[in-house]
Amino acid sequence: MKQKIVEPYAQALFRLKDDIDLTPLWEMARDSKFMQLLMNPSIPKEKKWQLFQPFDKLVQSWLEVIWKKKRMNLLAEICASYLELRKKKEGIVTVFVTSATPLTDTQTQQLEVQLTRMCQAKHLQCEYQVDAQLLAGLKIQMNGQLIDTSWQTQLKQLMKSLW
């Protein structure tokens, strides 16, 4: 339901201009203190609006529409949706890699070459994390798919088959 509300705002800005870096606005909107200030009815709108002065006129006009439609509480999600549209246009695929131990530079380079081929991306944006509970192997999440080669999962499957 939330996506149905969020996406039209992101798509509207994207259709007008598809190369705006909304990362600073997204980071501001993810800050709970910033959002409390923005949603505080005792602070005049003019004071709140000064926070958006660094952004260009198009972004300010877009924010005005979001404000009038009372959707500022969804600003972080709207910005994230816009940034995803930009990534898609630019051929950037975000990949989340979880390993049992930190990967070496050589391992990450080899993995990124293979993943780039697999997903046919122009650019790969990899985010790595370590989870010792995996025991060994990797979990790779990209394009809505999960590739799980961890020993933890293999052991669970073995236990299921035995019982």
Swiss-Prot record:
Q: Which InterPro entries match?
A: ATP_synth_OSCP/delta_N_sf, ATPase_OSCP/dsu
| Taxonomic lineage from the root | Eukaryota, Rhodophyta, Bangiophyceae, Cyanidiales, Cyanidiaceae
Q: Which UniProt keywords apply?
A: ATP synthesis, CF(1), Chloroplast, Hydrogen ion transport, Ion transport, Membrane, Plastid, Thylakoid, Transport
Q: Per UniProt, what is the membrane topology?
A: Peripheral membrane protein
**Coiled-coil boundaries:** none
The annotated subunit structure for this chain is: F-type ATPases have 2 components, F(1) - the catalytic core - and F(0) - the membrane proton channel. F(1) has five subunits: alpha(3), beta(3), gamma(1), delta(1), epsilon(1). CF(0) has four main subunits: a(1), b(1), b'(1) and c(10-14). The alpha and beta chains form an alternating ring which encloses part of the gamma chain. F(1) is attached to F(0) by a central stalk formed by the gamma and epsilon chains, while a peripheral stalk is formed by the delta, b and b' chains.
Name the gene.
atpD
Q: Which named protein is this?
A: ATP synthase subunit delta, chloroplastic
Pull one GO CC term from this UniProt entry: chloroplast thylakoid membrane
Stored PANTHER family: ATP SYNTHASE DELTA CHAIN
The places in or outside the cell where this protein is found are:
Plastid, Chloroplast thylakoid membrane
Family the entry assigns:
Belongs to the ATPase delta chain family.
Which is one Pfam family of this protein?
OSCP
> In UniProt terms, what function does this protein have?
F(1)F(0) ATP synthase produces ATP from ADP in the presence of a proton or sodium gradient. F-type ATPases consist of two structural domains, F(1) containing the extramembraneous catalytic core and F(0) containing the membrane proton channel, linked together by a central stalk and a peripheral stalk. During catalysis, ATP synthesis in the catalytic domain of F(1) is coupled via a rotary mechanism of the central stalk subunits to proton translocation.
- Which GO-annotated molecular functions does the record name? proton-transporting ATP synthase activity, rotational mechanism
